[in-house]
């Protein structure tokens, strides 16, 4: 539709009532698609709700915004936080027109910085179409023009462009034969619909479906999470299309525990959570060999989540972590009195070129959260075993585990023998996963089927966490593969980021494999609250785009509505079809495009008196540090204060899922060059690193990327 209205269109931005879409056009075909990753925050319904709160209509709200002299800066965060910002602005005396204008800016900033991730207006290309019902709001249109500094085309039917495009497509494919299936005017007089409700029993989700039967006998199903429910028929459980999520889940948890009389050391419970989706085969084999009967917690479901809600200390933690509470409760409800849930700081180092093999802070330490928040663990009859374990150091494990299980008097020789069996099973499973991946790829190649590598963490295997997205992919006629089934060590390093998390190292490897395979695409799963993905998502995108591929991210949490996921997957499928493998294979592929040369701060620069910019990170300590650095002969300038402009720069050049301090600190540094207060050819920047599993270790990589995107890649970054 946009191409028909503006031939040669380069970008299409669509903001509707519930979602945002950005289409980049190249050679008259969709080159990439970006959709808001999850909720409808910052879309048309967002403005409508605020207009009603202010006692006016959307049209009246927009008219007031156009009269504003001082729009309020309300940020681009979640609607919940925006509500707080609006209330604060009202307390400070802001007028309705200024609040309305501020909200219009927020909607556009949300689209530009979170969805499009715009670094420069030039990235939009010469011809831009804006559409969707939200752009019928003149205030939103004007905010877009002011923020991008360019005029755009808004069709008069902006809210109906989807229908217009569908009509154009129908006309293009019309053979001139047959009759339209649209309801005739005379049939509308007899139109009626009967509504019934039914529970789908095709999987454990048990969706509550609404079935609408129309007067002509056709039916429409709503409320279903996947295509199986829409069919109203029992589809065979075993599809020919590969679904490695289903296969791997059953393989990992398919072990048979010892019988009671063989388990001479008794029962021990293990929760089916987080890194157990990676390590359960290892721990099961170890404990079974030692004579324990391993009792696994049940499959996750929403009722299990609700069982543990009272002990969840933070609403901001990711859903996979929230589920842990319910799993521990379920084990205790079964009468298990010994629960083993270790804190694994380091995983095995499986990727030789990776910088480290940490687990993320949540995965590594969540047993401590459980210990300190689950009151039932204070029962003297309950033993909760949560030692800190380093799986990358095999030599120390026998002695360490003997200490952990001291009450069972296990000798170091017995523990060593059991560990050998555990390592064998762990290696066998990992090889089996790779073999299964190769088998599935070969099958898809022979049957001309496209595959989606649904990449995330091991715990995204959990159907309660992935909400049936693998089945949705299979329902669209594509195979669903896991990232560890396709990572084969072909990625060239070093990466821009510090590659320090074990699960993400193979995520990067899988991205390289996907980029090299014309029949594979990648969809990255991201759980709400995962701060690490602010680092990984950009790196995966660089790897894929360097190989001419599309990067798609799906954000998921405890809400099981898959509407946004379904839109994104279908959009991806349509974009791939339109682009075609022929074009992809003809593209120039840069397998090293993700590798960037780093500019070093040299002795010559220091002797020449180069300025070093330091952000304000700790006022008391830095007030002492800067004079010390001056005494050492370094020309250091401390950036004392932040401003709305520095935050705006941070939003523009840093992934908006990064923590607020990262946006402020990095925005502060880059803004010095953007505003012309620092010479990029005689200035370096300095930033600290934690050196641990926290994402703060990657502040330096975020800074390097931001400087490069802003056009200052020659600036040295000093990180320590």
What spans do the regions from the language model cover?
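Active-site nucleophile and cofactor-binding loops and adjacent substrate-binding regions
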Residues: 1, 13-17, 34-42, 100-105, ...
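Acidic-glycine-rich active-site phosphate/pyrophosphate-binding loop
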Residues: 15-26, 77-87, 134-149
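An N-terminal assembly and electron-transfer interface module characteristic of large anaerobic redox
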Residues: 28, 39-47, 54, 157, ...
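A mobile "lid/hinge" subdomain adjacent to the ATP/sugar-phosphate binding pocket shared
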Residues: 65-98
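Phosphate/ATP-binding catalytic cores across multiple sugar-kinase/actin-like superfamilies
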Residues: 99-123
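Glycine-rich phosphate-binding loops at beta-strand->alpha-helix junctions
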Residues: 106, 119-145, 158-159, 275-277, ...
